């Protein structure tokens, strides 16, 4: 039985003060979620990980933290990077790797993403490995080939039992355009087939909102969501976390 993971990626948003105030609103709104039914994850900016880890320590039983990236070395001359050892000290559970934004803005390769994912697993972190195609690649009929390459190269040598994959069609991220639920489900099913492990957790990401979450989570091969902009409002994110299957 695959346990859905609802994750909010704040990206480069919220100061430490704002993050704490957010949690003061969010945590009470999650109290009725069946804890055995789903897991809730927040990926704040690196600066907010420490205050949030301290704040939620004794305040909830169902909320975990994720980093927005992780380096493959434990330490060294890697300006602006964060090591897995640093994250371990903060009781961080997951690490997002391969998101389309660092792929686009910092030219991250599948090889680098693979190294990040391996480093995460080597330090007891669960990597959330993001894959997805551009609009042009989809229009040219290249979506499946591109995603399969990302899976094969990005997950080489990865322990699939300690892994989350997030399918995020790049053309749907932050655009208001959502991949139709049936099509997202089809791609997630293909990803599961390519990985070759039935119980791998596969999320969908791309303009997930409170008004489409119930349909998305009703799909048979979608095991959660990776939410961007819609996770910045605690009331809105709570509605997403409290989804009900149709």
UniProtKB/Swiss-Prot annotation:
Substrate binds at residues 9-11, 174, 207, 228-229. One of its GO terms (biological process) is gluconeogenesis. Pathway: Carbohydrate biosynthesis; gluconeogenesis; Carbohydrate degradation; glycolysis; D-glyceraldehyde 3-phosphate from glycerone phosphate: step 1/1. GO terms for molecular function: triose-phosphate isomerase activity. It catalyses: D-glyceraldehyde 3-phosphate = dihydroxyacetone phosphate. It is found in: Cytoplasm. It is an enzyme of class 5 (isomerase). One of its GO terms (cellular component) is cytosol. It comes from the Bacteria. InterPro entries: Aldolase_TIM, TIM_sf, TrioseP_Isoase_bac/euk, Triosephosphate_isomerase, Triosephosphate_isomerase_AS. Keywords: Cytoplasm, Gluconeogenesis, Glycolysis, Isomerase. Homodimer. This is Triosephosphate isomerase. It comes from Prochlorococcus marinus (strain NATL2A).
């Amino acid at each position: 039985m695959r346990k859905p993971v609802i994750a909010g990626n704040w990206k480069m948003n919220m100061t430490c003060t704002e993050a704490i105030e957010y949690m003061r609103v969010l945590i009470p709104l999650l109290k009725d979620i069946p804890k055995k039914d789903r897991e809730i994850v927040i990926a704040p900016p690196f600066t907010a990980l420490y205050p949030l880890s301290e704040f939620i320590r004794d305040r909830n039983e169902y909320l975990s933290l994720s980093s927005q990236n992780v380096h493959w070395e434990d330490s060294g001359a890697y300006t602006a990077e964060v090591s897995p050892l640093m994250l371990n000290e903060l009781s961080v559970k997951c690490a997002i790797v391969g998101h389309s934004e660092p792929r686009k803005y910092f030219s991250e390769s599948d090889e680098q993403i693979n190294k990040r994912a391996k480093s995460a697993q080597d330090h007891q972190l669960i990597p959330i490995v993001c894959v997805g195609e551009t609009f042009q690649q989809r229009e040219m009929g290249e979506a499946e080939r591109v995603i399969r390459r990302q899976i094969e190269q990005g997950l080489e040598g990865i322990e699939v039992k300690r892994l989350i994959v997030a399918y995020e069609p790049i053309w749907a991220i932050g655009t208001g355009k959502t991949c139709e639920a049936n099509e997202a489900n089809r791609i997630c099913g293909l990803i599961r087939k390519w990985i070759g492990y039935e119980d791998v957790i596969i999320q969908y990401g791309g303009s997930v909102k409170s008004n489409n979450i119930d349909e998305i989570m009703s799909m048979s091969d979608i095991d959660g969501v990776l939410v961007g902009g819609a996770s910045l409002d605690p009331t809105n994110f709570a509605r997403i976390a409290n989804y009900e299957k149709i």
